[in-house]
Amino acid sequence: MDDARLVVVNAIQAHELGAQIRTQTRCISAVQQEGVWCLTLEHQKQHYQIKARTLVNATGAWVTDFIQQQLSKTPKAGIRLVQGSHIIVKRLYPEPHAFILQNDDQRIVFVIPYLDEYSLIGTTDVEFEGDANHVYITEQETAYLIDVINDHFKLQLQPEDVISSFAGVRALYDDASTQASKVTRDYVLAMSKPVADEAPLLSVYGGKLTTYRKLAEAALLQLKRYFPHMKAEWTAEAKLPGAEGFSSVEVLCAELMHEIKGLESQTAHRWANSYGSRVWHMLGENKDVQTLGQSFGHGLYQQEVDYVVKREWAVSSKDILKRRTKLYLKFDALETQALDLYLQDLHLRRMQGDAA
């Protein structure tokens, strides 16, 4: 599963249903005023206010920090941060299989085919204490994952075989478990008890992306009494953007190769995986790669860059290469610099257009 892509398409769907998506924005404070929440937000060093009837604190690793710092309140529960890290190496085997490797410490490690050319290996479970804004894989974690692979595969890995890595922290509900791997992965929803006409606060402790819809429905169930006209649950049958009229990646790839002159199969496959049927929105009226604008390399064209900036809130080259396309594994420094220069010009033109 491409977790970053899942988050983006959910944001797209929410936007299409009327939500306002505000990226690169920080909440400075939230206070109760006349039965509603008044939030002060910061975007590009500019402050502004919005009001809300309910506040959902789904800030993950910062759930208790938000309560303490932005709300000036005491959290009702605590969290434990557990670091999980992955490494990416050249594909270990040609078959489309995933492996679950049982280690002698009773943990399991997954090996999953990743982006056709690579294998994704993970994850670790390490207690984390530090700044959740800055999380990196450690040498010990890298060695641990390599050792697990070498215990199970004839092909032996070395640290220099690691092409890339990434690490994150899981914000888990603190159930007083002594081992990081034993901490509950279940979510806990903590609803404030408003007095008089105060607006409610719902804080989400724990949870994971694989059960995000279940968590969201449980959260809305708790909020239903504050919104008597709330509709019934509907997401079980709802398709995410890009799944409309979509049959399979293979069928869509064939359609793209037939419709777009000069398109490489690898790019068609990436588009089909990333955008689904929304790929036609991205392409517009273009029927030839020669009309897709500047080529940044590795199948990334100006047409796609403009689309993810305009429709998917991408701002930086990191947004595009790492969070939208995964092409960071192929781009070198000069290619990334060319994309950065184009984005600077694009943002300048958009600002001038807004000013006009």
Task: Locate the predicted segments by residue.
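Flavin (primarily FAD) binding-site architecture
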Residues: 57-73, 217
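Helical element adjacent to the flavin cofactor pocket in flavoenzyme catalytic cores
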Residues: 1-54
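Glycine-rich, histidine-containing beta strand-loop boundary motifs that form or position
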Residues: 23-25, 31, 59-60, 91, ...
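Long non-globular sequence segments
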Residues: 354-356
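Glycine-/small-residue-rich beta->alpha transition segments that form the dinucleotide
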Residues: 52-64, 92, 125, 209
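C-terminal catalytic lobe of FAD-dependent flavoproteins
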Residues: 3-9, 13, 71-121, 127-334, ...
